[in-house]
C-alpha cells in the first residue's frame, strides 16, 4: 500500500486560513474531491491528513472526514500542548466520531520565537500526555530549534516523534553541512522518523538535483525504515503539481531496493501512525 504521509485539507467557506492570504495559488479550498484524482494518477492508496491551524475546531472535522473517506487512514491533529487538561482533551478527540483515526498531534513550534520551546516544562508535560495516549508527535520546527528537538527526543524515549519536512533545511550551498550536523543527533534516536516532505517548495526547479544531497543525508542517518514520503499537498503547488512532487521523491529514492522503497512509500508511515497496510 502506497501512503502519502503528509497532506492538508481546508475549506475557506468553513474557516479562513490566514497564512494563505499572500499566496494566491493556495487561496481557495482544497478538499478530498480535489485530491482523490491526484492520488489515483500517482497510484497512492492512502493518506495521512495533517492539521494546519492551532484551533480546536479543525481536528474533529478532520476526524469526521476520515470516518467517511476510506483514503484517509490517519489524522495528525492539534490540541493545546501546554494546557493542564491536555490528557482530557486527547481522550475527547479519541472518543469523537472518527477518533480511531487520530494518530498524532502537531503544534507549529516553528512559529514559536523561543528556540527552546520544546524544553519548557508545560510543553514536555504535553508531549508526555501525547505519548501516554498512544499517539505520535509531529515536530514542525525551524533549523535553530533542532537542538531542542534532539534533546527532547533523547529525553523522551517512550514518545514516538516524526520530524516534518526534514526539519525545514535551507537549500543552499552552505546549508547542507550545517543542517546535516544538527540532524545527526536525531538520527541516533530510534524513537523518531522523518518525512521526505515539504522540500520542493524550498528548492529551485528542477528540484531533484539540489535536493539529492539532502535526501542522501536522510537515508544515511535514518534509513528507509525511518523515512516516509509526504506530498505536503496543496502547499507543494507553490512549486509543482502533485504528480511532480511524487516524481521528485521517486527520483531521490530511485536507488532503493523494492523492499526499501516500500518502507519509504508506506511501511514507515503505517508503523509510526498505526495504520493498516
Question: What do the predicted segments below correspond to?
Answer:
Residues 6, 47, 62, 75, ...:
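Conserved, mostly hydrophobic/aromatic
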Residues 1-3, 26-46, 217, 221-228, ...:
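Mid-to-C-terminal alpha-helical segments outside catalytic/metal-binding sites
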Residues 117-228:
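Catalytic pocket-lining loop regions of alpha/beta-barrel enzymes
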Residues 8, 53, 110, 167, ...:
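Catalytic metal-binding/acid-base residues of hydrolase active sites
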Residues 30-35, 57-58, 85-91, 146-147, ...:
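Alpha-helical scaffolding within the catalytic cores
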Residues 57-144, 151, 193-200:
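Active-site gating/metal-coordination segments in enzymes
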Residues 1-66, 247:
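An N-terminally biased module of ancient metal coordination in phosphate/nucleic-acid-related enzymes
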Residues 57-73, 157-163, 214-220, 245-252:
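Short, electropositive alpha-helical surface patch
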Amino acid at each position: 500500500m502506497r501512503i502519502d504521509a503528509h497532506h492538508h485539507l481546508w475549506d475557506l467557506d468553513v474557516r479562513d486560513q490566514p497564512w494563505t492570504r499572500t499566496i494566491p495559488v493556495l487561496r481557495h479550498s482544497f478538499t478530498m474531491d480535489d485530491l482523490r484524482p491526484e492520488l489515483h494518477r500517482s497510484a497512492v492508496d492512502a493518506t495521512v491528513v495533517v492539521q494546519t491551524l492551532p484551533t480546536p475546531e479543525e481536528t474533529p472535522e478532520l476526524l469526521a472526514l476520515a470516518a467517511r473517506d476510506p483514503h484517509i487512514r490517519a489524522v495528525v491533529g492539534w490540541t493545546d500542548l501546554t494546557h493542564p487538561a491536555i490528557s482530557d482533551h486527547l481522550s475527547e478527540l479519541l472518543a469523537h466520531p472518527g477518533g480511531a483515526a487520530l494518530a498524532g498531534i502537531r503544534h507549529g513550534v516553528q512559529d514559536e520565537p523561543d528556540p527552546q520551546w520544546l524544553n519548557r516544562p508545560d510543553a514536555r508535560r504535553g508531549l508526555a500526555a501525547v505519548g501516554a495516549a498512544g499517539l505520535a508527535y509531529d515536530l514542525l520546527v525551524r533549523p535553530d530549534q533542532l537542538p531542542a528537538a534532539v534533546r527532547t527526543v533523547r529525553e523522551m524515549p517512550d514518545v514516538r516523534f516524526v520530524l516534518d519536512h526534514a526539519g525545514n533545511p535551507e537549500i543552499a550551498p552552505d546549508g547542507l553541512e550545517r543542517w546535516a550536523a544538527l540532524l545527526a543527533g536525531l538520527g541516533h534516536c530510534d524513537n523518531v522518523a522523518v518525512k521526505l516532505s515539504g522540500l520542493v517548495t524550498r528548492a529551485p526547479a528542477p528540484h531533484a538535483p539540489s535536493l539529492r544531497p539532502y535526501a542522501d543525508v536522510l537515508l544515511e542517518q535514518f534509513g528507509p525504515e525511518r523515512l516516509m514520503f509526504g506530498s505536503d499537498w496543496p502547499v507543494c503547488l507553490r512549486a509543482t503539481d502533485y504528480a511532480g512532487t511524487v516524481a521528485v521523491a521517486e527520483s531521490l529514492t530511485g536507488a532503493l531496493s523494492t523492499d526499501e522503497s516500500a518502507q519509504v512509500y508506506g511501511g514507515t508511515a503505517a508503523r509510526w501512525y498505526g495504520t493498516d497496510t
